[in-house]
Amino acid sequence: MTDISILNDIQKIIVLDYGSQYNQLIARRIREFGVFSELKSHKITADEIRDINPIGIVLSGGPNSVYADGAFGIDEEIFELGIPILGICYGMQLITHKLGGKVLPAGEAGHREYGQSALRLRSESALFAGTPQEQLVLMSHGDAVTEIPEGFHLVGDSVDCPFAAMENTEKQFYGIQFHPEVRHSVYGNDILKNFAVNICGARGDWSMDNFIDMEIAKIRETVGDRKVLLGLSGGVDSSVVGVLLQRAIGDQLTCIFVDHGLLRKNEGDQVMDMLGGKFGLNIIRVDASKRFLDLLSGVEDPERKRKIIGNEFVYVFDDEASKLKGVDFLAQGTLYTDIIESGTETAQTIKSHHNVGGLPEDMQFELIEPLNTLFKDEVRALGTALGMPDEVVWRQPFPGPGLAIRVMGEITEEKLETVRESDAILREEIAKAGLDRDVWQYFTVNTGVRSVGVMGDGRTYDYTIAIRAITSIDGMTADFAQLPWDVLKKISTRIVNEVDHVNRIVYDITSKPPATVEWE
């Protein structure tokens, strides 16, 4: 059996996309159980599902009514495939509507629910095995089921929802009116695991080790003896892609690392030493710092900064790529979330596909995106499985424009140096305190504000540095990290004593929303 054939034998649970903001969380939670899961369009046909051969199907939630014009439907032959189905929120209403039950708009049914609610189990169910008879769940629905289809029976209700959970054990169809994928549903993970393992019979055969074997085989089959180009940023995603490609095709890979002069302290050298030295990647380092800083001189508007950096990065990359001969493929660190966030027919675009969108139209490469089925935490797990050290795998997220958006106002060498040095101190002290895995993201910002201070016997008028540290689960929302006061005090003392032109430290205690993580 070839490594590629293993991919076809891996058990899969597919999630049909009906537009819920939580869709990717469903797939992510299922993967945590060692079961491969991915989103598919709600327009998928029964024949297409037969080709995929999943062990289970989840119908996601969504913002629409089953009675609305253009409401998202389902190929009803899917109900005849003999595959277990779990309908979540809109998915439960769709099952009910298509199989002969009744769904009413909230105004008529009187059962609108938003927020946490107490679910009461009225009968035993394999879906709820090991969970308490009463449990908190997250409800978010306008319409409501008022009559369940023939062959189904009631499993659970809530004060405002007479049919909060239902099942047809003969067909292995299950419907729940709440969202088990979010953490506000206290036993949601147990419910999803019961569906995957106890009902669908998942054996948990999805792991990073078999992903590596399959992806290497896939890369070798796709590339053959041709050459691949990778734009290396030093971040986690492109670094993991580089190491994976190196293992797959060796010296057929060439990496271009554009140093725009906006990196963190010693970051350029660390990239070269680690990826070029330890892992043997063939890296062309381009020192374009003067080129970028000259273009940014006098620019204060953050959007102009971003556009200048983005455009110039493409020009520099294109210049270097044009010097290479016989390259057929461009590799990118596109993640599954990038593809989802690019927008689907069921959801608005959150952001454009940043990896592809900025490339010149005349760059005629075939794309290789080895990580495009993985979430961020899975990329870190992949890096660890590839033998990459923690300092690379757990590197702090870093924006494409680099320190340019952590310097408020005009960018100068002096301001950049204050951020580089203060950020290095912050990262060092967070690590020393053992908090580097607990805090989602942390960095410093030169606020562009000067204030009066006293150092020694002299008056100073220097920059104010802000510390930003957040906790989060998925990055969509965030709270400021409540760092211990002694740690903050040490960080502040070190920065004002060790970093020139800084005399004041402030701590950003704003959540997201209303603030964003980055200041610009």
From Swiss-Prot:
A Pfam match: GMP_synt_C
Pathway(s) where this gene product acts: Purine metabolism; GMP biosynthesis; GMP from XMP (L-Gln route): step 1/1
Domain of life where this protein originates: Bacteria
Domain Glutamine amidotransferase type-1: 12-205
Residue numbers binding ATP: S233, G234, G235, V236, D237, S238, S239
Catalyzed reaction equations: XMP + L-glutamine + ATP + H2O = GMP + L-glutamate + AMP + diphosphate + 2 H(+)
Catalytic machinery residues: C89 (nucleophile), H179, E181
Keyword Nucleotide-binding: yes
Matching CDD domains: GATase1_GMP_Synthase (cd01742), GMP_synthase_C (cd01997)
Listed EC numbers: 6.3.5.2
Listed GO MF terms: ATP binding; GMP synthase activity
Record-level GO cellular component terms: cytosol
Record keywords, A-Z: ATP-binding, Glutamine amidotransferase, GMP biosynthesis, Ligase, Nucleotide-binding, Purine biosynthesis
HAMAP family: GMP_synthase (MF_00344)
Subunit structure: Homodimer.
Function of the molecule: Catalyzes the synthesis of GMP from XMP.
Name of the protein in its database record: GMP synthase [glutamine-hydrolyzing]
Organism: Streptococcus agalactiae serotype V (strain ATCC BAA-611 / 2603 V/R)
Lineage: Bacteria, Bacillati, Bacillota, Bacilli, Lactobacillales
Gene name, Swiss-Prot/TrEMBL: guaA
